[in-house]
């Protein structure tokens, strides 16, 4: 689904009941006779320690997936036999109304959310007992450590705390049209914010000014929450993958790496762009940028339903090696295959090519193996084949991080491939990463990210602003 179509999709309700049916089907794949009730609790209101103010509220993603409800202190029951979904919301607290106004009513919640019934939270135990009495041998499925002490589950034949959480995680991999629409809209908002930073980068003196520009643009477009802490990294700071200081001077530095994106109604976007602060790439920066862009374009061309993500990641390393050979950082005379086999390219591209994206920036279902003895795959967050309907980031990068590269320079196994004298010309490049968000389709992919990444176009925007 192209991003331009998202407004029509988002006119409807978040498809919570469709998601509940998906979860039941996942459970049924291993338990054909599944019966009973799915039980979930939303995030509770929490107070800041030693303070009378509430913590920032963030809904539990497992609860949101089956409700679309962003209210705190709620519960959900889903009767598998009848496919009946009931949301329980807090009743009116007169003292709270003084400060916060009237809360959403049960009728308003029923009109807003894709559920069959809305009741109040003091009714949940009675409702659970009634569901259990209707099917005495049935099971209640819940998530461990997410059941309040006041909840009894009396009358159920069994309590299962093992299957619901992984079932939701599996179901979340393939997105509904509504979910894709939310991610697409978040991408468009984030893309506009990236453009605002491009237009301002030449006129600021500190990273924090660009950080503020990005936040302001997202908030003004209706997305006040970021999907993750923004990375606004000038110069050599861009070699730190998750740099979060965002308060260093920009003067005298070559490039800015901006990894920043908003979330919309609990759904994340995740975009990275790298561009010259002055408006013109240096030859060294342009060589690395072109290599990273080719890494992305060639791996994007491989994407379709059933592609093995490990293979796509390996190809990104091949292109990186070709680019580093062309730049002279890897010594001539060695083959791409030989350098690939040595894993020396991991010094410059140490992370995985991408990750699933959804309600979490690093979304569920990736089956990563962080104990993999092969350094090329240790931080690959998705393993195996990609299903149609999944949303994944494609974010190759090349970095010049002294802390990471120095051990390779001291190890003959790797140092024989690296020309240290040429490498010295590239430290100020810092790091280059380019990241888009794509939906996997049967025969290819749909790129949801609209932020500009053509080198000449970025230079033109910066120089003319």
Swiss-Prot record:
Keywords from the UniProt entry: Aminopeptidase, Hydrolase, Manganese, Metal-binding, Metalloprotease, Protease
UniProt GO MF annotations: manganese ion binding; metalloaminopeptidase activity
Cofactor note: Binds 2 manganese ions per subunit.
Cited SUPFAM superfamilies: Creatinase/aminopeptidase (SSF55920), Creatinase/prolidase N-terminal domain (SSF53092)
Disulfide bonds: none
Cofactor: Mn(2+)
Residues annotated as binding Mn(2+) 1: 270, 395, 435
UniProt-listed Enzyme Commission number(s): 3.4.11.9
GO biological process: proteolysis
Catalytic reactions of this protein: Release of any N-terminal amino acid, including proline, that is linked to proline, even from a dipeptide or tripeptide
Family to which the UniProt record says this protein belongs: Belongs to the peptidase M24B family.
Record's function text: Catalyzes the removal of a penultimate prolyl residue from the N-termini of peptides.
Record protein name field: Probable Xaa-Pro aminopeptidase PEPP
Gene name linked to the record: PEPP
